[in-house]
Amino acid sequence: MRNINGEILSKNSSFEVNGKSNTLGGVLDFNSKNEKLNATLKNIDIQELSTMMNYPKFFDAKANLTFDYDSLLKKGNFNGNLLNGHFIENSFTTLFNQLSKEDLTKEVFETFDINSKIDDRILTSNLNMKSQNTQISIEDSILNLEKNLIDSKINAKIKDNSFAIALSGEALNPKISIDLKDLIKEKIIKQLEKKKKKIRKIA
């Protein structure tokens, strides 16, 4: 983070800090008043953010983020909107590509919204992503930052293929399980449709 420009205000028992800084390829604005912190990050680089947080790079995009937190209650909200991004090749995209027979890294996501509730060191998140051919959603994903544990179910659809991927255990190296019921069901339906067409031609 580069130099922060701002001001410090102190009156009676109230203490307030306002600041602005160029960071992560974008701009940080924040206000901290007593136990409450409000911050916005505009047009930041997600790859730079991943590096700063010591997480593997998995997505390339610019993002607008808001963060509200009460340090006394240890509760807050984190919301983000990523702009026209795409996945970087990783273990998740490799698995996704094997299941869907499509290349996820070539999909450009016009919509990528994430909303998280913070309760002490636990984040509960919902995520929605959409591109021309792909839709990915996550509901009530749990990330325990203190224990570095994750419990999440990813619902994915690319073109006519649907499946679910569950992540559990260590956040940086989670156990992965796959629910292929919808994918198998769709393949069976396609096979039945092909057989129906052949029967019609013979008839």
Write out the residue ranges for each language-model feature:
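Small-residue helix/turn framework positions
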Residues: 5-189
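Exposed regions on extracellular, virion, or secretory-pathway luminal proteins
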Residues: 1-2
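Short, low-complexity, Pro/Ser/Thr/Gly-rich segments in the mature regions of secreted, periplasmic
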Residues: 192-203
